Amino acid sequence: MSNKGQLLQDPFLNALRREHVPVSIYLVNGIKLQGQIESFDQYVVLLRNTVTQMVYKHAISTIVPGRAVNFSTAEAAGSDASA
């Protein structure tokens, strides 16, 4: 994965994880999963609800936070947050 992708993904997913924001994750096949992001890496997201599910990022279409989230791309990029 390119560094540019990580400049957006990592701070966004990390803010969702840190703030325990409830999310809806839509998969490419249309299935909707709900829960809180427990952890993530380059390839997967761990989604916790009544159980913890490992969801492969290539299967994710959209992640919708349950509330507004403030995150900064500067967390990952230092002072150069330009895309």
Curated annotation (Swiss-Prot):
GO molecular function: RNA binding
GO biological process, one term: regulation of translation, ncRNA-mediated
Pfam families: Hfq
Segments traversing the membrane: none
CDD domains: Hfq (cd01716)
Keywords: RNA-binding, Stress response
Domain Sm span(s) in chain numbering: 10-69
KW RNA-binding (keyword) present: yes
UniProt GO cellular component terms: cytosol
Superkingdom, natural source: Bacteria
Subunit structure as annotated in this protein's UniProt entry: Homohexamer.
Primary role: RNA chaperone that binds small regulatory RNA (sRNAs) and mRNAs to facilitate mRNA translational regulation in response to envelope stress, environmental stress and changes in metabolite concentrations. Also binds with high specificity to tRNAs.
Family of the protein in this entry: Belongs to the Hfq family.
The name this protein goes by in its record: RNA-binding protein Hfq
Annotated organism of origin: Delftia acidovorans (strain DSM 14801 / SPH-1)
Organism lineage string: Bacteria, Pseudomonadati, Pseudomonadota, Betaproteobacteria, Burkholderiales
